[in-house]
């Protein structure tokens, strides 16, 4: 059996994601495992309030871990309700939307920060969405 880089904790019945795609993206960028939580709007709002003091839901959160040998890179939390809503609104699949949010969260775990860098995160997102034939990235949509 192949070792997985991603450990999934799904608190919902959402299943519209491609684990092989996410494993491929992850292994391209890191050899450290990643924890992935899939939650609903209510749980995401609670996490956002607790850890960022922002009392509203969001689509993706990242929680990096310290550089401890054999420890995961960190945790990515994706809001399944937002995935479904945004995919429908933008006219692409929930699997594609999930992959975009996963990439966004993974890049944050790797130290990229679109709020303070000089476009490096946006460039890396664009590279990955082209390579994996995904729709426009979260950052690109934000700036349009």
UniProtKB/Swiss-Prot annotation:
Q: How is the cofactor bound?
A: Binds 1 zinc ion.
Task: Name it.
Answer: Endoribonuclease YbeY
Enzyme Commission (EC) number:
3.1.-.-
Q: Sorted alphabetically, which InterPro entries does this protein's record hold?
A: MetalPrtase_cat_dom_sf_prd, YbeY, YbeY_CS
Q: Name one Pfam family in it.
A: YbeY
| Entry cofactors | Zn(2+)
Source organism of the structure: Nitratiruptor sp. (strain SB155-2)
Q: One Gene Ontology cellular component annotation?
A: cytoplasm
Annotated NCBIfam families:
rRNA maturation RNase YbeY
Cellular location(s): Cytoplasm
**What residues form the membrane-spanning segments?**
none
Enzyme's top EC category: hydrolase
Keyword list (alphabetical) reads: Cytoplasm, Endonuclease, Hydrolase, Metal-binding, Nuclease, Ribosome biogenesis, rRNA processing, Zinc
In this chain, Zn(2+) is annotated as bound at 104, 108, 114
**Source organism superkingdom:** Bacteria
The family line of this record is: Belongs to the endoribonuclease YbeY family.
Predominantly, its location class is cytoplasm
Q: Which GO MF terms are attached to this record?
A: metalloendopeptidase activity; RNA endonuclease activity; zinc ion binding
- What does it do? Single strand-specific metallo-endoribonuclease involved in late-stage 70S ribosome quality control and in maturation of the 3' terminus of the 16S rRNA.
């Amino acid at each position: 059996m192949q070792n997985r880089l991603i450990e999934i904790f799904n608190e919902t019945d959402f299943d519209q994601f491609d684990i092989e795609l996410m494993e491929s993206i992850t292994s391209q960028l890191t050899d450290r495992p990643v924890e992935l939580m899939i939650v609903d709007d209510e749980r995401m709002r609670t996490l956002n309030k607790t850890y960022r003091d922002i009392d509203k839901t969001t689509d993706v959160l990242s929680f990096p871990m310290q550089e401890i040998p054999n420890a995961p890179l960190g945790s990515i939390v994706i809001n399944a309700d937002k995935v479904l809503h945004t995919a429908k609104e933008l006219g692409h699949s929930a699997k594609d939307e999930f992959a975009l949010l996963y990439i966004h969260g993974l890049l944050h775990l790797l130290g990229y920060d679109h709020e303070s860098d000089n476009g490096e995160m946006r460039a890396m997102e664009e590279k990955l969405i082209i390579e994996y034939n995904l729709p426009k990235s979260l950052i690109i949509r934000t700036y349009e």
